[in-house]
Amino acid sequence: MQLKTLLTTIILAIIFLSFLLLNEFNLLSKKNDRELKNNTNFDSIVVLTGKFDRIKKGFELLEANYSKKMFISGVNPIVKKNELRKIIIPNNSTEKISLFDCCVFIGKEAKNTKTNAVEVIKWMKKNNLISVILVTSDIHLPRSILEFQNNTNHIKITSWPVKTNSNNFINFLKEFLRFSFVRIKYLIL
């Protein structure tokens, strides 16, 4: 009888914890529209590499004057800045090229979300920056925010999720499990 009660309690605790984590995951994956409307002058736009939609969205925010600087974290070490520019600006617009050349910075050290946070925080401290628009995919955003929040309390993050294929349940589940692992890890440590 006690074993049955213990198992029931454990299962209910897991369900409750999963519900809390799913709720937090859902909240963190949303765009902070209120913060974006109240502030159009951020210290930096930070893009975590992945699909090129993220980098293009970050550059659109730079063009819209949300910030004067954009940092792309986790760029493959063999990719040159001018190669990245050609992908983002395929039509060779002189104005866009000038903006890219002056205001886009790339980091090549990060290999995962945790090292993205470390790389970005290091760059922001070096440049005395505090507020940032964080651009990444909607399902990657919650874990990214956790990594940033748990590696510094000196920056103010406003999120800009880039929509992914929400029909892919496997990708959602993988990212939710990664998020849950990171959340529990930081709660324990």
Report each predicted region and the residues it spans.
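A structural signal for short, hydrophobic/glycine-enriched beta-strand patches
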Residues: 22-172
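Hydrophobic membrane-insertion alpha-helices, especially the h-region
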Residues: 6-23
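A transmembrane-helix-recognition feature enriched in membrane-embedded lipid enzymes
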Residues: 168-188
